[in-house]
UniProtKB/Swiss-Prot annotation:
Domain CoA carboxyltransferase C-terminal, residue spans: 32-289
Domain of life of the organism encoding this protein: Bacteria
EC number(s) per entry: 2.1.3.15
Protein's UniProt name: Acetyl-coenzyme A carboxylase carboxyl transferase subunit alpha
Keywords: ATP-binding, Cytoplasm, Fatty acid biosynthesis, Fatty acid metabolism, Lipid biosynthesis, Lipid metabolism, Nucleotide-binding, Transferase
Molecular function in Gene Ontology: acetyl-CoA carboxylase activity; ATP binding; carboxyl- or carbamoyltransferase activity
Length: 314
């Protein structure tokens, strides 16, 4: 339960208590239950239509929030995962492969968090090593060769900052991806589905179209990190989240992303299938908007997008 959801938790407890009493004592409490359920719906709408930036940060970090592998079966047909960077090893924090979107072969790449403690250790909490970014680039170059559109799912706190990752060239692997992605001659469409953290997000985020789920975040540093750097106090993360403009609607207003995809009431985890279908619809629409461009025009469109990205507000 998140802090701002406490009023909802209390109403749900009352509903469960009344239902239990109704079953145990064979009394009719349905009218009271109906009133509380109506109150719960009203309060849920009120809370989720007035979320603060820090509230959205908490939602983006939820353990139960859908991951790349949760969405893929609903969006793409016959997905086949491909492994390895052909240099060092496979990185489970970065998944990729080939699937079909409405009958068309596409390449799918995404950061992958774990679903529980054991899985998170295996997936390194969604923080990819250099071999993860090199695997992603290998699949992107393969997609370019076979003229397959590329779809990427961004969901990471950042690239892994450990000693071994640095020794194997973490910064070089991300920098190379930025250079190579800028000139790919096939459509690239990216979506931030959770946290989009720093260079770790950009390593698969240089796209013709960049989308965000409405409760996702996109930033150069975490609010806690920014607060520690700016004010020497990580406890001021809530203020930092508001100052940094890291939420989807703020970033859309700044011209950094192309579209915001709505989430089910309560967040994407409340209805994964509904959320996935909304993403699929956006993917199809964005891909259609690029169909008239030649291969050279697609690369130039992406290059110019990032040359002119963002805005300055005094």
């Amino acid at each position: 339960m998140l802090d701002f959801e406490k009023p909802l938790f209390e109403i749900r407890n009352k509903i469960e208590s009344l239902k239990e009493s109704q079953d145990k004592n064979d009394v009719d409490l349905q009218e009271e239950i109906d009133m509380l359920e109506a109150s719960l719906e009203r309060e849920t709408k009120k809370i989720y239509t007035n979320l603060k930036p820090w509230d959205r940060v908490q939602i983006a970090r939820l353990q139960e929030r859908p991951t790349t592998l949760d969405y893929i079966p609903y969006i793409f047909d016959s997905f086949m995962e491909l492994h390895g960077d052909r240099n060092f090893r496979d990185d489970p924090a970065m998944i990729g492969g080939i699937g079909f979107l409405n009958g068309r072969a596409v390449t799918v790449i995404g950061q992958q968090r774990g679903k529980d403690t054991k899985d998170n250790i295996y997936r390194n909490f969604g923080m990819a090593h250099p071999e993860g970014y090199r695997k992603a680039l290998r699949l992107m170059k393969q997609a370019e060769k076979f003229n397959r559109p590329i779809f990427t799912f961004i969901d990471t706190k950042g690239a892994y900052p450990g000693k071994a990752a640095e020794e194997r060239g973490q910064s070089e692997s991300i920098a190379t991806n930025l250079i190579e992605m800028a000139s790919l001659k096939v459509p690239v469409i990216a979506i931030v589905i959770g946290e989009g953290g720093s260079g770790g997000a950009l390593g698969i985020g240089i796209a013709n179209k960049v989308l965000m789920l409405e409760n996702s975040t996109y930033s150069v540093i975490s609010p806690e990190g920014a607060a520690a750097l700016l004010w020497k106090d990580s406890n001021l993360a809530k203020i930092a989240a508001e100052t940094m403009k890291i939420t989807a609607h703020d970033i859309k207003q700044l011209g950094i992303i192309d579209d915001v995809i709505s989430e089910p009431l309560g967040g994407a985890h409340k209805d994964v299938e509904q959320q996935a279908l909304a993403i699929k619809s956006a993917f199809v629409a964005q891909l259609d908007s690029l169909e008239s461009l030649s291969r050279d025009e697609i690369a130039n469109d992406r290059f110019e997008k990032f040359r002119n990205i963002g805005s300055y507000i005094e």
